[in-house]
Amino acid sequence: MMLHAQHMPGQPGAPSLVFLHGFSGDCREWQPVGEQFHGCSRLYIDLPGHGGSAAIPVGRFADVIRLLRATLISYNILKFWLVGYSLGGRVAMMAACQGIPGLCGLVVEGGHPGLQNEQARAERRLSDGRWAERFRREPLTEVFHDWYQQPVFASLTAQQRQALTALRSQNNGETLAAMLEATSLAAQPDLREALNALAFPFYYLCGERDSKFRALAQEVAATCHVIRNAGHNAHRENPAGVVDSLAQILRL
């Protein structure tokens, strides 16, 4: 089984860019950024429970990594960079730390490297469980209205919150809930040590108004690019700034 994706060809010999969206996003999320890099082939993946992969079930984080590997093989992608935001960034870090053939480098935007103690994991498990139950039972417009009130989204304007709530409410609540549980931060190991031992380039992007993830970026051995005039979702709030950073990273 493979994940649904959109593939855009590039020049032969250049590494591919594989884009992974955040929770409740889909393969379109990264396209305003990725389509500025026509020289590289681009693969925009729908993660399980999302978009064209909504019906693909997963029970564990390991299932997501297995599906990612199968998808890359199916597109014959042998040399690539992983670029992931939030949930997609965590998937990218997990894949990189477990070893994935052909990976040239890693770019993570606002992805958490992992909780560091069991109490924090237990608290997160309870929190994610409550959100999952709401996604299953309540109208998505109501759930996402509250979702975007979380502190990590504090930099959003009321208009931005309304737009995101309308966009994300097009998802399937049941499949979002299943993916949230399978990939909960509580189910992710602390990746700091493994990330610091990576043998290939690792870059971290974060919005200048995203104080939580700017602090987390200092805990991993990554070169950090701070995106001006942006909060947690930097590639949505300032796509040109993220394009500039990626161009520097990829030397394009």
Curated annotation (Swiss-Prot):
Class of this enzyme: lyase
Entries under SUPFAM superfamilies matching the protein: alpha/beta-Hydrolases
Pfam families assigned to the protein according to its UniProt record, in alphabetical order: Abhydrolase_6
GO molecular function ontology, one term from the record: 2-succinyl-6-hydroxy-2,4-cyclohexadiene-1-carboxylate synthase activity
EC number: 4.2.99.20
Biological processes, Gene Ontology terms: menaquinone biosynthetic process
Pathway: Quinol/quinone metabolism; 1,4-dihydroxy-2-naphthoate biosynthesis; 1,4-dihydroxy-2-naphthoate from chorismate: step 3/7; Quinol/quinone metabolism; menaquinone biosynthesis
Keyword terms, alphabetized: Lyase, Menaquinone biosynthesis
Catalysed reaction, written as an equation: 5-enolpyruvoyl-6-hydroxy-2-succinyl-cyclohex-3-ene-1-carboxylate = (1R,6R)-6-hydroxy-2-succinyl-cyclohexa-2,4-diene-1-carboxylate + pyruvate
Function: Catalyzes a proton abstraction reaction that results in 2,5-elimination of pyruvate from 2-succinyl-5-enolpyruvyl-6-hydroxy-3-cyclohexene-1-carboxylate (SEPHCHC) and the formation of 2-succinyl-6-hydroxy-2,4-cyclohexadiene-1-carboxylate (SHCHC).
Stored PANTHER family: 2-SUCCINYL-5-ENOLPYRUVYL-6-HYDROXY-3-CYCLOHEXENE-1-CARBOXYLATE SYNTHASE, PROTEIN PHYLLO, CHLOROPLASTIC
Quaternary structure and interacting proteins, as annotated: Monomer.
Family to which this protein belongs: Belongs to the AB hydrolase superfamily. MenH family.
Alphabetized HAMAP family for the sequence: MenH
Protein name: 2-succinyl-6-hydroxy-2,4-cyclohexadiene-1-carboxylate synthase
Gene name of the record: menH
